[in-house]
Amino acid sequence: MIHPLLQQPSYRIIDQSSLGTMFQAEQSFATDDTLCASTQERGAVLRAWVHTDTIVLGIQDARLPHLKEGIRYLHEQGFRPVVRNSGGLAVVLDDDVLNLSLILPEKDGIQIDSGYEAMTSLIQHMFQDVTNDIVPGEVVGSYCPGSFDLSIDGKKFAGISQRRVRGGVAVQIYLSVRQSGSARAEIIRDFYDLAIQGEETKFTYPTIVPETMASLEDLLGIPLTVQDVLTRAYRVLSTVSLLQNATLTADEQTMFASQLERMWKRNEPLRDIEQQLTEE
């Protein structure tokens, strides 16, 4: 049975999965904070987003002892780093990674586990015609490990995080749809190697074993695109709610501008490092 939290009266559908390189991760995180703040009034949202060749870093990643060397490596691999405004650690985003944000009004105080369970339920129902083997639980050796990693046969293809802002909850998931999950993990492994260089750190960063990660296409043995996965999400939610295509309202656009300013500020130290690298 589908998780009761998913049974909202309606969902605004905001599809930002094909905006290309002009749409940057800072804009995504600012959008989710904006939608969290308006969801009490405007109702639930499903937002889809894709970012080309981006490494999203957690707050702890920004404190790595040799961060500059890590950033240099990411640039050499063609990736743009961004520090997110929620918990978690480094993840890889590219054109074959679909991100979904469930933005839910927190009317009765949504328990943290309930948010994770709702997203897990959505993904399980999206693929129930193909597999019943999608399970939550930390996959040791994966990047950004957490108790609500999603895996099939021990190989992780998705990770879930949450962000709470002013009466709303954003439950965010990345889904590795196609291409090599282990190749993505190698990038994060090498980033940590260069950014830590064997030094002792207060925070314990994961030891990445690339073979613990895979893509949905590889795990399910069926051809998949980002659009295929998105269609499956719409199909599931349409059985329990009314779906309406939407964009940000005028009020939300105003709020978005101030949230985006916060994200730019949060990322100023990274941009400073990038400036130093270009001057070397």
UniProtKB/Swiss-Prot annotation:
Catalytic EC class: transferase
Matching SUPFAM superfamilies: Class II aaRS and biotin synthetases (SSF55681)
Pfam families listed in its UniProt record: LplA-B_cat
An example Gene Ontology biological process: protein modification process
InterPro entries in UniProt: aa-tRNA-synth_II/BPL/LPL, BPL_LPL_catalytic, LipL, Octanoyltrans_LipM/LipL
Annotated site (Lowers pKa of active site Cys): K156
Domain spans labelled BPL/LPL catalytic: 40-245
UniProt superkingdom: Bacteria
GO molecular function: lipoyl(octanoyl) transferase activity
UniProt entry tagged with the keyword Acyltransferase: yes
Pathway noted in the entry: Protein modification; protein lipoylation via endogenous pathway; protein N(6)-(lipoyl)lysine from octanoyl-[acyl-carrier-protein]
Similarity section: Belongs to the octanoyltransferase LipL family.
Role summary: Catalyzes the amidotransfer (transamidation) of the octanoyl moiety from octanoyl-GcvH to the lipoyl domain of the E2 subunit of lipoate-dependent enzymes.
Name assigned to this protein: Octanoyl-[GcvH]:protein N-octanoyltransferase
Gene: lipL
